């Protein structure tokens, strides 16, 4: 027999394909199938691999289909398409045999045409998924273990599912199908008509049946960690849906019918491939949480401003270059995450977010902040690390509830004196800027506990720093300090003091008053001696003095720290 070079898989007679499939599923049968072995290296198997990909992902290019198929079956990229097809067969047969052993003992009779071909691949896969679903339904064990049932072929068992659900599952309200190996959701799921919560996360779903829209009582639908490339328009029929979780899928767009989910409160879409949102997103009048982290959004529709109940909006790790002015209409918004985008400015309307408590803008390209930022009267956490800010507006001092302010890795050369008005501030991070001095007003931050000033260009500290009576951590490493003010000894709560890589030639005796100090870092300075008062630091655990020209260390200190 000559190798096949162009015949489609569907047209292969069962007599020809059967030995190939048997050989793939049961390697020991290779010995009796040598006469067919040449087919395994022909165009048959690679062609079958491509067509199986179309079964799972009907739309999209070949590369997308192959990518999804490889993820479903966890195939090694280094395998050829023919080898991948064989691996798919083997896994499918193994699973099918575990579900309905009588169906796949490989005692096939050619004349009965009982063969696993591409023509019936979709229906065969459906019956595997039917049995996977069935095994998660309560009360199924006794029925499936009946002699007359368990020896039926897989297809015959699968055909019984609908009737069994109609008879036994009317009152099921919660169904957990997570991590059971589903490659698609059997349409019989719609027969569980009272279902309120459905969890089908951590499977290999590439699509949802249109029948999903018939679950009229469904309130929570969790589909995280699948391979979904699209949603059916029927999703909009879930009129009672309150929570929809679609994290970690392959979605590139949302159907406009998403706007029909009038009761939806929480929508999770992080780690997909969305490039835009439909304008109908603005119709979700009850939405409180919208998570779009780690997508490919380049802009937001102006209709986003219609989400009048929205409290949490997560947009980290997208490609946003600007925000629409309408974002200021989100009057109930409390949390706004915009880290790792490409924002160069914020709209002035940002100041209208009167309920905002957390604003995170790390790793953008902001060069300035609008003065309206001072209107955020409820703001408690403001994150601006890794931007290009050269100054702060004086209105920053109006943030009377601010507790944490992060400004590391910017280009700040000074701070406005209004910074001292932040009476609730507990954390101030200014490391890796270009500060040459600190204002005396820094001492007004009476609640400050953590102050990070490392990697700046400070040559001195104001005496007012001693007024920071609640300060616990003070990082000043990698500056140009030559001395410390004696007032540093007044920081009675200080536990960590990092002064590595400065130009200190001496320490004030008042350092011995830091009664709670535990860590003192003084590496790479110009110290020639230490004040004896260091010996009074009864809580000190770590003292680092490397790379100093020390000549005189009190014996008590030397013994205590094994110097």
Where are these regions (language model features)?
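N-terminal Skp1-binding subsegment of the F-box domain
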Residues: 2-38
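LRR N-terminal entry segment and analogous cap-like coil->beta motifs
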Residues: 43-48, 57-199
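The feature encodes a structural signal of leucine-rich repeats
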Residues: 162-164, 185-187, 208-210, 231-233, ...
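Leucine-rich repeat
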Residues: 168-169, 191-194, 213-217, 236-240, ...
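Conserved hydrophobic beta-strand positions in leucine-rich repeat
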Residues: 175-177, 198-200, 221-223, 244-246, ...
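Long, intrinsically disordered low-complexity tandem-repeat regions
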Residues: 252, 258, 262, 274-275, ...
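Leucine-rich solenoid repeat scaffolds
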Residues: 530-563
């Amino acid at each position: 027999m000559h190798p096949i070079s162009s015949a489609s898989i569907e047209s292969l007679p069962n007599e020809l394909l059967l030995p190939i499939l048997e050989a793939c599923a049961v390697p020991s049968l290779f010995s009796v199938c040598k006469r067919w072995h040449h087919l395994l290296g022909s165009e048959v198997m690679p062609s079958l691999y491509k067509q199986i990909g179309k079964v799972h992902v009907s739309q999209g290019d070949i590369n997308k289909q192959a990518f999804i198929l490889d993820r479903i079956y966890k195939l090694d990229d280094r395998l050829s398409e023919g080898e991948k097809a064989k691996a798919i067969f083997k896994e499918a047969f193994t699973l099918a045999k575990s579900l309905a052993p009588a169906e796949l003992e490989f005692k096939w009779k050619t004349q009965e045409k009982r063969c696993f071909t591409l023509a019936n691949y979709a229906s065969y896969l459906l019956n595997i998924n039917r049995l996977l679903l069935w095994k998660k339904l309560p009360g199924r064990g006794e029925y499936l273990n009946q002699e007359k049932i368990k020896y039926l072929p897989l297809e015959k068992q699968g055909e019984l599912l609908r009737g069994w659900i109609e008879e036994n599952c009317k009152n099921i309200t919660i169904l957990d199908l997570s991590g059971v190996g589903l490659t698609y959701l059997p349409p019989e799921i719609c027969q569980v008509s009272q279902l309120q919560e459905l969890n089908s996360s951590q499977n290999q779903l590439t699509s949802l049946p249109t029948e999903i829209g018939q679950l009229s009582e469904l309130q929570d639908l969790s589909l995280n960690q699948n391979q979904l490339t699209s949603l059916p328009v029927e999703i909009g029929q879930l009129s009672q849906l309150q929570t929809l979780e679609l994290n970690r899928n392959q979605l590139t767009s949302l159907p406009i019918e998403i706007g029909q989910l009038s009761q939806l409160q929480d929508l999770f879409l992080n780690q997909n491939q969305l490039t835009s949102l439909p304008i109908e997103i603005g119709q979700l009048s009850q939405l409180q949480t919208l998570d779009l982290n780690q997508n490919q959004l380049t802009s937001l529709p102006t209709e986003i401003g219609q989400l009048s109940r929205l409290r949490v909006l997560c947009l980290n790790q997208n490609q946003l270059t600007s925000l629409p002015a309408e974002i200021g209409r989100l009057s109930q918004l409390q949390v706004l995450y915009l880290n790792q985008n490409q924002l160069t400015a914020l709209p002035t309307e940002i100041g209208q977010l009167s309920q905002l408590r957390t604003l995170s803008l790390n790793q953008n390209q902001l060069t300035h902040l609008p003065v309206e930022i001072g209107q955020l009267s409820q703001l408690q956490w403001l994150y601006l690390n890794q931007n290009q800010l050269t100054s702060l507006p004086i209105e920053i001092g109006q943030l009377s509830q601010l507790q944490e302010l992060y400004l590391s890795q910017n280009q700040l050369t000074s701070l406005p004196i209004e910074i001292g008005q932040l009476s609730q501030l507990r954390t101030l991070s200014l490391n890796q800027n270009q500060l040459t001095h600190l204002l005396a007003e820094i001492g007004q931050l009476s609640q400050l506990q953590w102050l990070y000033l490392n990697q700046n260009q400070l040559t001195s500290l104001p005496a007012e720093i001693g007024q920071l009576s609640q300060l616990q951590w003070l990082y000043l490493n990698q500056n140009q300090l030559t001395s410390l003010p004696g007032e540093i000894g007044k920081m009675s709560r200080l536990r960590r003091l990092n002064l590595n890589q400065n130009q200190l030639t001496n320490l004030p005796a008042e350092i011995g008053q830091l009664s709670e100090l535990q860590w003192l870092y003084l590496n790479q300075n110009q110290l020639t001696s230490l004040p004896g008062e260091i010996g009074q630091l009864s809580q000190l655990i770590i003292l680092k003095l490397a790379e100093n020209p020390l000549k005189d260390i009190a014996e008590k200190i030397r013994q205590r720290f094994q110097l």
